[in-house]
């Protein structure tokens, strides 16, 4: 099954996540099909906290991709910010 989930990056104690489209059997930070955005939970000041390519996310959802619980929350937050 294809999922949209977070892949962790960054360094120790400073997380940074990429929103990735991947096969659910792949490792969390392993091979992915496409990166569709990022999430920086510790963004400060003028740094961007959340960036999502809505066109690609909509495409993958229409193809049957299932977002993880956290990604679903982030997509809702991004849609609210865009409106």
UniProtKB/Swiss-Prot annotation:
The keyword Ribosomal protein applies. One of its GO terms (cellular component) is cytoplasm. Pfam families: Ribosomal_S16 (PF00886). InterPro entries: Ribosomal_bS16, Ribosomal_bS16_dom_sf. One of its GO terms (molecular function) is structural constituent of ribosome. Keywords: Ribonucleoprotein, Ribosomal protein. The keyword Ribonucleoprotein applies. One of its GO terms (biological process) is translation. Belongs to the bacterial ribosomal protein bS16 family. This is Small ribosomal subunit protein bS16. It comes from Pseudomonas putida (strain ATCC 47054 / DSM 6125 / CFBP 8728 / NCIMB 11950 / KT2440).
